[in-house]
C-alpha cells in the first residue's frame, strides 16, 4: 500500500505536486512505523528514477515527512541509506532544480538538528561532503525547516484537506499552486473571508436557519474552504515560522466557522446563547462586548458593595426593631399586669403565688418564666426605690412614722375600696420585705 501511494504521488505524469497524496502518505507514516519504513524505501527507489519530475516529487515528499513526523523519519532515512543516494544525485550534476532542492534540504535539516553535535550528525556529514566537493547554490536567508507536529495540525484537518483535494482534482491544485502569492497575502485574504462569513452566520436565526442555505452564504462557505486549502498548503511549504504559526491558527478558525455552518444546516444549534464559543464567536444575534479582567473586577466590587450595603441596612433595621421592642416591653407588660390584677378575684390573693408570676394574671407561659425587669447591679440596688417612683402614679399610704397622716388616709379611703390596694399591688416593686433585690417582684406595702 505504501509503495503504491508513493508511486502515485511521484508519478512522472503529474504536472505538479499532488498534495492530497502527500498528506495521505504523511498520515499513514505517522500511524504505523512499519508503513513509515516502507514509505522511505519507496522514496529511495523513486529517487533513482531517470525522470527529473519524479525525483523532484520524491524530494518534496521526503521534505514533508521530515518536517511533520520528525525523529522516526530521520531514523528511517539513515537506516535505509537515503542520504548517500541524495549526495550521489547532487554530485552527478543532474537536473538543476532537483540538485538545489536536495542541497537546501540537507542544509536546513542538519542545522535544525544541531549540526555535528546533534542527535543525527549524519545529515551534517552528508551536507559538508557536498560543500567540500565544491557544490554551491544560492541559499535562502535563515532557511530552517519548520516542524509542524501532529498536535499543531489536527488529523481531522488533514483528512478534510485530503477530501477536498481529491474532489477538486489535480488540475485545480495545479492552477492554484502555480500562482506565486506571498504568505501575508494568503493570510489576509483568508482572514477577510473568515470575518465576512462570521458576520453572516451571526445574523442567521438559529431557530430558523434558512439564511444559512441561501446562495450568498454558500458562496462564502466555498470561498472559506478554498482559503483554508491555501492556508494548509502554506503550512506545509513555508519556511517562515511566523507565517506558519499564523497560518495554523487561521486554519483552526476557518475549520470552526465551517463546522458552525454545518451545525446550522443540520439544526444542531437550536437555542441562541450569549456565551462565547470556543472559537471566539458569539452565537447570539446581538454583538456581545468582551469583558476584560478590569471590567470583571469592577463589577465584582460593585456587586460586593451593594451586598454589603443591603446587609448593613437590614442589620440596622433589625437592631432598631429589637431596641424598640425592648423599650416598649416593660410598659406594655405593666399594662398587662394591671389588667390581670383588675380581673383577679379576692380569694385568689390568699393563694400562694408562683415564684415568677402574678396570681390571677393572664400572662403567657413564656412571660411567666422570665423576670419582669432585669436585675440591677449591686451598687444600684439602693436606688431601686427611686427608679420605681418613675413608674405610673400609684396611691400609697403614708409611712408608719407619720401616724396622724396615715390614720387620716385610711379614713378617707375606707369607703371606696382603696384598702385593698396593697394586696393588689403585690408584684410591682423591685424589692422584697427585707429590702433585698428579688426577681419574683412580690412585695406588700402594708405595715
UniProtKB/Swiss-Prot annotation:
Residues 178-266 form the GAT domain. Residues 272-282, 303-314 have a biased composition (Polar residues). GO terms for biological process: protein transport to vacuole involved in ubiquitin-dependent protein catabolic process via the multivesicular body sorting pathway. It is a peripheral membrane protein. Pfam families: GAT (PF03127), VHS (PF00790). Keywords: Acetylation, Cytoplasm, Membrane, Protein transport, Transport. GO terms for molecular function: phosphatidylinositol binding; ubiquitin binding. The modification N-acetylalanine is found at residue 2. Residues 437-447 have a biased composition (Low complexity). Gene3D superfamilies: 1.20.58.160, 1.25.40.90. Residues 322-331 have a biased composition (Acidic residues). It comes from the Eukaryota. This is TOM1-like protein 5. It comes from Arabidopsis thaliana (Mouse-ear cress).
Amino acid at each position: 500500500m505504501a509503495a503504491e501511494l508513493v508511486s502515485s504521488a511521484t508519478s512522472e505524469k503529474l504536472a505538479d505536486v499532488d498534495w492530497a497524496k502527500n498528506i495521505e502518505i504523511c498520515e499513514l507514516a505517522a500511524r504505523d512505523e512499519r508503513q513509515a519504513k516502507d514509505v522511505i524505501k519507496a522514496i529511495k527507489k523513486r529517487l533513482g528514477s531517470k525522470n527529473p519530475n519524479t525525483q523532484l516529487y520524491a524530494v518534496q515528499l521526503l521534505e514533508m515527512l521530515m518536517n511533520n513526523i520528525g525523529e522516526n523519519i530521520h531514523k528511517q532515512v539513515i537506516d535505509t541509506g537515503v542520504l548517500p543516494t541524495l549526495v550521489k544525485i547532487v554530485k552527478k550534476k543532474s537536473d538543476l532544480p532537483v540538485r538545489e532542492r536536495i542541497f537546501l534540504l540537507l542544509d536546513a535539516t542538519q542545522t535544525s538538528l544541531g549540526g555535528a553535535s546533534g542527535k543525527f550528525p549524519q545529515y551534517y556529514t552528508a551536507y559538508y561532503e557536498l560543500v567540500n566537493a565544491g557544490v554551491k547554490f544560492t541559499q535562502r536567508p535563515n532557511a530552517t525547516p519548520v516542524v509542524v507536529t501532529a498536535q499543531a495540525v489536527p488529523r481531522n484537518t488533514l483528512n478534510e484537506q485530503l477530501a477536498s483535494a481529491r474532489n477538486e482534482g489535480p488540475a485545480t491544485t495545479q492552477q492554484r499552486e502555480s500562482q506565486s502569492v506571498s504568505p501575508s497575502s494568503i493570510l489576509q485574504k483568508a482572514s477577510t473571508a473568515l470575518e465576512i462569513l462570521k458576520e453572516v452566520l451571526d445574523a442567521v436565526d438559529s431557530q430558523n436557519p434558512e439564511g444559512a442555505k441561501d446562495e450568498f452564504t454558500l458562496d462564502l462557505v466555498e470561498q472559506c474552504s478554498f482559503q483554508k486549502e491555501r492556508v494548509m498548503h502554506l503550512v506545509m511549504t513555508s519556511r517562515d515560522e511566523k507565517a506558519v504559526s499564523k497560518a495554523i491558527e487561521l486554519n483552526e478558525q476557518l475549520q470552526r466557522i465551517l463546522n458552525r455552518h454545518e451545525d446550522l444546516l443540520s439544526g444542531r444549534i437550536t437555542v441562541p446563547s450569549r456565551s462565547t464559543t470556543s472559537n471566539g464567536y458569539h452565537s447570539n444575534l446581538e454583538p456581545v462586548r468582551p469583558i476584560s479582567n478590569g471590567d470583571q473586577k469592577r463589577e465584582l466590587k460593585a456587586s460586593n458593595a451593594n451586598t454589603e450595603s443591603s446587609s448593613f441596612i437590614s442589620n440596622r433595621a433589625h437592631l432598631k426593631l429589637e431596641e424598640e421592642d425592648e423599650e416598649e416591653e416593660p410598659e406594655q407588660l405593666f399594662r398587662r399586669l394591671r389588667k390581670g390584677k383588675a380581673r383577679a378575684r379576692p380569694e385568689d390573693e390568699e393563694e400562694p403565688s408562683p415564684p415568677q408570676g402574678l396570681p390571677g394574671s393572664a400572662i403567657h407561659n413564656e412571660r411567666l418564666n422570665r423576670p419582669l425587669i432585669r436585675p440591677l447591679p449591686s451598687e444600684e440596688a439602693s436606688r431601686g426605690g427611686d427608679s420605681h417612683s418613675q413608674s405610673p402614679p400609684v396611691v400609697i399610704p403614708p409611712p408608719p412614722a407619720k401616724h396622724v397622716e396615715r390614720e387620716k388616709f385610711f379614713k378617707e379611703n375606707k369607703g371606696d375600696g382603696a384598702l385593698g390596694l396593697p394586696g393588689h399591688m403585690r408584684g410591682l416593686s423591685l424589692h422584697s420585705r427585707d429590702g433585698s433585690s428579688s426577681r419574683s417582684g412580690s412585695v406588700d406595702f402594708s405595715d
